[in-house]
């Protein structure tokens, strides 16, 4: 509960000015609860309207994205870029391509990105973007045409010293490559810092693909060691099977854990012998298939419909790596009931 009068007043204004945006309002309330410990020590913040500026994006860009599918029919999606805060550096945050993407979710993610980036101690601001385009089931040519159309509008708002988007759900090296190629053609120069997550052969960074998944495991390993534990011999459940989840599973396995379950939006797989990462990577990276294929190809593995049911699998450590807000109260209760002693997100 927020009891600070200044924060209460700002929150009321945010709720009035941003109706119908539950994800964004949730993020603001959560951050304000933490800020209650700090705000009373800095009365100058209220005089300067600092929190009011903190919760209002500097710029919101919304645009249509027309593209042609393989049947020659024009499709239209909506694109977003929320440039939230550039106080300490260029806007930085990923692009998400998923049917659930809307303005509230993009603002929610962009708002949290300000704080995430500031914690790195690097001079990066916060932003987020994306589209309600669904790359699943689309051909490479369709994804390419969409990405080219998307960046043809967004290019005028980004740059290596202005805004440097990256990947997120639905946006990997393939999509970043399509967008960067179109960006380079439009601006007629090689601008290596404008889109991060590129392939190594055209300006990408070593281990960028693995960074987020590895990062959660390195962080978790430090926490475990602080409590006299480690990944060694622990049974782990990881939700998701995208970029973050895949490399979290890889690093977790290297650190001695046994990943027994992973999921996608339709259901989850359970392999009591531990997920075979070679098979998983082949299915998800090369074939871009559903995770259910794993159960068809690996003896002893099972596929269960319903991705939320993954938290019913017995484990020592649970790692939500699919999307935001994915572990609700029921999921948390299930994780505890099934023996987990740690949750890392």
Locations of the language-model features?
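N-terminal ligand-binding/catalytic initiation module
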Residues: 1-206
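Short glycine/threonine-rich loop-to-helix capping motif typified by GTGT followed
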Residues: 136, 174-176, 243-252, 332-333
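Fold-independent oxyanion-binding glycine-rich loops
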Residues: 136, 167-168, 182-183, 198, ...
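ADP-ribose/adenylate-binding Rossmann-like module
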Residues: 316-345
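Generic beta-strand/beta-sheet core signal
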Residues: 77, 239, 247, 263-265, ...
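Solvent-exposed alpha-helices and their adjacent loops that cap or buttress functional pockets
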Residues: 55-57, 70-74, 89, 123-125, ...
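Glycine-rich phosphate/diphosphate-binding loop of Rossmann-like nucleotide-binding domains
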Residues: 199, 204-312
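Structural beta-strand/beta-sheet cores of well-ordered domains, especially the beta-sheet scaffolds
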Residues: 59-65, 78, 234, 255-258, ...
């Amino acid at each position: 509960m927020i009891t600070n009068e200044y924060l209460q007043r700002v929150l009321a204004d945010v709720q009035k000015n941003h109706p119908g945006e539950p994800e964004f309002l949730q993020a603001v309330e959560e951050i304000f609860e933490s800020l209650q410990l700090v705000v009373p020590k800095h009365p100058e913040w209220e005089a300067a309207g600092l929190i009011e500026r903190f919760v209002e994006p500097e710029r919101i860009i919304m645009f249509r994205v027309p593209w042609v599918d393989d049947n020659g029919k024009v499709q239209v999606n909506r694109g977003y870029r929320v440039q939230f805060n550039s106080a300490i550096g260029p806007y930085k945050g990923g692009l998400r391509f998923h049917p659930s993407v809307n303005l509230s979710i993009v603002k929610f993610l962009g708002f949290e990105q300000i704080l995430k980036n500031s914690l790195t101690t690097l001079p990066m601001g916060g932003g987020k973007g994306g589209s309600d385009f669904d790359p699943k089931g689309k051909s490479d040519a369709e994804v390419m045409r969409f990405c080219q159309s998307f960046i043809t509008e967004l290019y005028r708002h980004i740059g290596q010293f202005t805004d440097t988007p990256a990947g997120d759900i639905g946006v990997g090296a393939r999509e970043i490559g399509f967008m960067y190629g179109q960006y380079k053609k439009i601006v007629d120069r090689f601008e290596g810092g404008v889109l991060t997550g590129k392939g190594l052969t055209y300006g990408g960074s070593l281990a960028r693909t693995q960074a987020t998944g590895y990062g959660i495991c390195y962080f978790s390993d430090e926490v475990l060691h602080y409590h006299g534990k480690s990944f060694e011999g622990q049974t782990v459940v990881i939700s998701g099977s995208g970029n973050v989840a895949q490399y979290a599973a890889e690093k977790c396995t290297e650190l001695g854990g046994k990943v027994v379950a992973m999921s996608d939006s339709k259901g989850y797989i359970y392999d009591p012998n531990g997920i075979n990462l070679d098979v998983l990577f082949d299915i998800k990276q090369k074939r871009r298939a559903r995770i259910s294929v794993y159960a068809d190809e690996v003896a002893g593995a099972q596929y269960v419909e319903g991705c939320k049911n993954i938290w019913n699998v017995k484990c020592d450590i649970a790692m939500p790596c699919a999307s935001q807000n994915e572990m609700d109260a029921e999921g948390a209760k299930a994780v505890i009931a099934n023996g987990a002693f740690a949750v890392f997100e």
